[in-house]
A protein has these predicted regions:
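Short beta-strand segments
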Residues: 64, 151-157, 205-207, 244-246, ...
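Conserved active-site and cofactor/substrate-binding residues in soluble primary-metabolism enzymes
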Residues: 20, 36-43, 68, 134, ...
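The start of beta-strands in P-loop NTPase/AAA+ ATPase cores
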Residues: 83, 126, 150, 202, ...
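Active-site loop/helix belt of alpha/beta enzymes
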Residues: 3-4, 159-308, 373, 410
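Charged (often Lys/Glu-rich) extended helix/loop segments that serve as interaction or gating elements
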Residues: 268, 274-277, 282-431
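A charged N-terminal "starter" segment
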Residues: 1-151, 187, 191, 195-200, ...
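Active-site-proximal loop/turn and secondary-structure-junction residues that shape catalytic pockets
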Residues: 67-69, 90-91, 111-113, 132-134, ...
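Short acidic, glycine/serine/threonine-rich loops at helix termini
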Residues: 74, 97, 117-122, 139-142, ...
Length: 431
């Protein structure tokens, strides 16, 4: 298993994160347990700022809350001078509950409800990322009723293929997100917002997908958008003050993922942005980014207790754990692959070929298939790396499983940031 950030093996042969023995964390908080390396989260934010602050560009970085959000993480984002990209009234409420600056929040979503729009306007968020023609009418009407004026980015789909999983590709022609440039819908969107009485169009947004290595797709999208922006300036006298290119920076889950440094990606994007603006005779807009997975993904680990070990001679050995697809859905949903280890026996030889099985009542509840670990014993602590993004945020109560606790660690100290759900929590809304 490749360790990230402060991850190391201590003198007892245990996995240690943030100066804290992970086995002691399981003893203290139980399992399953999510553990986040707070120092690594902060370091990732600073890597983005370091490159962009030297670029000569005006820029803004918004953390993509859908990857993982909780009050403590919002506080950290505030301290690291990050904005927030939220996609629901729940994420917005979470951010506002710790007095995050609403002007540094923007609201996404392909089907924003009237309640969400009204709540966002009342909260004075920085801007809406408009996703459809119907939404233009909705925001304009509700804004007029409330006496509020909204700022908006229009989300466009540039028709660029991202080489990633089908379910997390968002910038191609057939997408539920945004308005298409090629078929004229995006232009209709621009015209509709410019006509609106209660909306100011301040820029454009696109996002071609997630878990992307390299910048070929992003550069192609930037170039295409700038050609289109030149047409908009000539025909509609519209100039985008902001270009938000989303996120999607990939992380390393296994050796199959080819690492692509954030610094290299950002330098290439910045160069492309400047050259594209220059070639079209346009001013360089403010650059907005929305990293999520690349901020928290490698900082997160999930710890489980090993339970039943079942050998099917000549076929497979199943090592079952006390969690599963209720807290780790990405393997079942995407076929995602992960590295695993025994956190209490990190120095031992990976001699056994096994499949890690979750405890949910589904044959497809597998965490990792045909992986090597030391010969497992009941009570061992299994660790899955790189579970910081799209794990707790996608967790469910399937089989009425309790969602795990979440702990942040840093400088030898641990802090509970989300409590484990109780049995009472599972039924408190039932009548």
């Amino acid at each position: 298993m490749q360790l990230h950030g402060s991850g190391r093996i201590n003198s007892q042969g245990h996995l240690e994160i943030g100066g804290v023995d992970t086995c002691s964390l399981v003893d203290k908080y139980g399992s399953p347990l999510f553990v986040y390396d707070e120092g690594l989260i902060r370091d990732q934010c600073r890597r983005f700022h370091k490159v962009l602050s030297k670029s000569g560009l005006d820029y803004h970085i918004s953390y993509a809350s859908k990857a993982f959000i909780c009050k403590e993480l919002v506080r950290i984002m505030k301290e690291e001078d990050m904005g927030l990209d939220v996609v629901s009234v729940g994420e917005l409420y979470n951010a506002l509950s710790v007095d995050f600056d609403s002007q540094k929040i923007h609201l996404h979503g392909n089907n924003k409800t009237e309640h969400e729009i009204g709540y966002a306007l009342e909260s004075n968020i920085g801007c809406f990322v408009v996703d459809s023609l119907a939404e233009v009418e909705r925001i304009d009407r509700i804004g007029g009723q409330m006496g509020k004026r909204a700022k908006a980015l229009l989300r466009v789909t540039p028709g660029v293929e991202a080489h990633t999983h089908e379910f997390i590709t968002t910038g191609n022609t057939d997408s539920k997100f945004g308005l298409n440039i090629d078929n004229g819908q995006a232009r209709e969107g621009v015209e509709a917002i410019l006509r609106a009485e209660n909306i100011d169009l301040i820029g454009l947004h696109f996002h071609i997908g997630s878990q992307i290595f390299g910048t070929e797709g992003s550069q192609a999208a930037i170039k295409k958008v700038f050609v289109w922006l030149k047409d908009l300036k000539e025909d509609l006298n519209f100039e985008a003050k902001i270009l938000n290119i989303g996120g999607g920076f990939g992380i390393r889950y296994t050796d199959e993922d080819v690492s692509y440094p954030i610094e290299d990606a950002l330098e290439e994007i910045i160069t492309c942005l400047k050259e594209s603006a220059r070639s079209q005779g346009l001013a360089i807009p403010q650059l907005w980014l929305e990293p999520g997975r690349s901020i928290v993904g490698e900082a997160g680990y999930t710890l489980y207790r090993v339970g039943t070990i079942k050998e099917i001679p000549g076929i497979r050995t199943y090592v079952s754990i006390d969690g599963g697809m209720s807290d780790h859905i990405r393997t079942a949903l995407y076929g995602a692959k992960y590295e695993v280890a025994l956190a209490n026996r990190m120095n031992e030889e990976d001699a056994s070929l096994v499949t890690i099985a979750g405890k949910c009542c589904e044959s497809g509840d597998l965490i990792a298939k045909d992986v090597r670990i030391p010969e497992a014993k009941i009570g061992d602590i299994l660790v899955v790396a790189c579970t910081g993004a799209y794990h707790y945020s996608m967790a469910s109560n399937y089989n009425l499983m309790q969602r795990p606790a979440v702990v942040f660690v840093r400088d030898g100290k641990d802090k509970i940031v989300i409590k484990r759900e109780s049995l009472e929590d599972l039924i408190k809304n039932q009548v």
